[in-house]
Amino acid sequence: PGKEFKVGKKHIISKMVDEVTEIFMGMGFSIAEGPEIETVRNNFDALNAPKDHPSRDMTDTFYITEDILLRTQTSPVQIRTMEEAVKDNDLPLKIIVPGRCFRSDSPDATHSPMFHQIEVLVVGKDITFTEFKGTMETFVKKLYGPETKTKFRPHNFPFTEPSAEIDVSCFKCGGAG
């Protein structure tokens, strides 16, 4: 008989993406994917990123040509998906967009030239911010447990209005420090 082969384990990021995806699919979302090599139009212009925004600089973005780059966020998939949905008259839309992103960052404890991002997008009529909050709170509690607390803070993202960031209590210590 041959030598026993040790089977590897799934990477922690892959496990997390699978878990997040499963939670959102359970809430009626579908997965949207797109290319990692993108156009300036989809990565910046269509997302209302100002022409002078620092993220467009050569020092922050990996440009392949003047108009082609490695995506800096998964948001270009939103543009592609929304354009397709409008063309096909396929609304409302509920998607989750997991994927790799690239930025010209110096590696440290909080930065990496390649990182993973997951975005959530809902497009439809009569959708309220309260429904968004409820969706995100449901997600957080399913991921970290029912006792997890959330706090929504207003934030400015050029491509969403209104915008918010979400703080989550520590799943390990419950916020005790």
Report residues per predicted region.
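TRNA-recognition modules of translation machinery and tRNA-sensing kinases, especially anticodon-binding
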Residues: 4-177
